[in-house]
Amino acid sequence: MGSSCLPPGFRFHPTDEELIGYYLSRKIEGLEIELEVIPVIDLYKFDPWELPGKSFLPNRDLEWFFFCPRDKKYANGSRTNRATKAGYWKATGKDRKITCKSSHVIAGYRKTLVFYEGRAPLGDRTNWFMHEYRLCDIDDHSQKSPNFKGAFALCRVVKKNELKKNSKSLKNKNEQDIGSCYSSLATSPCRDEASQIQSFKPSSTTNDSSSIWISPDFILDSSKDYPQIKEVASECFPNYHFPVTTANHHVEFPLQEMLVRS
C-alpha cells in the first residue's frame, strides 16, 4: 500500500499501547490488520535518511513506522544487530514498560535508540531517533530479562526538527550574551553615570558676599530705584535684605557694597 491509497485527511498517530496491543500483536499472531499502513523491511540494511522512501505514510510528521525482523547480533545471543552501512543505532536509557490500561498487564517494552554516523564507538550523534517496540510473553513480565515474543519488532523512526533545535540554541545564546553584558558593575552601561553621580558634590549653600561675582551689566546707580532688578536679585540672593526706596528717603542694604555709586 502506498500513500496514494490512503483516504483524504488520514493521520496515523497511534499510542504505544495501540502499537503493541493491536499492530504488533496481530502481526506476530498472523491476524489481519484492518489498514496495512506499516510495511515490513529489514530496517538495519538502510541508513535512516533512506527510510522515508520505504514508508507507506506521508512524511509530513517526520516519523515513519516499520515492522522489522529481529536479526540477532550473535547466533547464540539475544542482542539485535543494529549496524547499518553508514553508522549504527545505539540504545539510550532503560526500556519502558508498556501496560494495557484495561488489564494493567505489561504487554511489551519500548526501547529508545539514537543513530550515530561512523563506526562504534567513535560515531557522531545525529538527529535521528527510533522507538523499538517488542512484545513479551505475559507469563514472563516479572523477570528481569523478559522473553520477547515473535520474530518482529515494530519501529517508529523519528527525525528531530533541526530548525527548532537551532532556533532554541540561538535564543539561549542571545539571552546568555545579553546577561553577560550586565553581569558585573564594570560592564554595566550605568557605571559611568553612577560614578558621575557619586563624584558630584553640591556647591555650598552658604552665601559669601566676598566671593560673589557681579557682571558689569549689573553695575547700577544706587541712587535710583530698580524694582525689576530687585525682584530678580531677591530670587538669586534670598539671604540678603534689599532697600526700600521712597521719594524722600533711601535705605542702605548690604548689596550696595557690590554696586558702584554714580
From Swiss-Prot:
GO terms for biological process: cell division; cellular response to auxin stimulus; response to wounding. GO terms for molecular function: DNA-binding transcription factor activity; sequence-specific DNA binding. It is found in: Nucleus. Coiled coil: none annotated. Pfam families: NAM. Keywords: DNA-binding, Nucleus, Transcription, Transcription regulation. Induction: Induced by wounding in the flowering stem. GO terms for cellular component: nucleus. It comes from the Eukaryota. Its main location: nucleus. The NAC domain includes a DNA binding domain and a dimerization domain. Transcription factor involved in tissue reunion of wounded inflorescence stems. Required for the division of pith cells in the reunion process, which is dependent on polar-transported auxin and the wound-inducible hormones ethylene and jasmonate. Binds to the promoters of XTH19 and XTH20 to induce their expression via auxin signaling. XTH19 and XTH20 are involved in cell proliferation in the tissue reunion process of incised stems. Involved in hypocotyl graft union formation. Required for the auxin- mediated promotion of vascular tissue proliferation during hypocotyl graft attachment. PANTHER family: (WILD MALAYSIAN BANANA) HYPOTHETICAL PROTEIN, PROTEIN CUP-SHAPED COTYLEDON 2-RELATED. This is NAC domain-containing protein 71. The gene is NAC071.
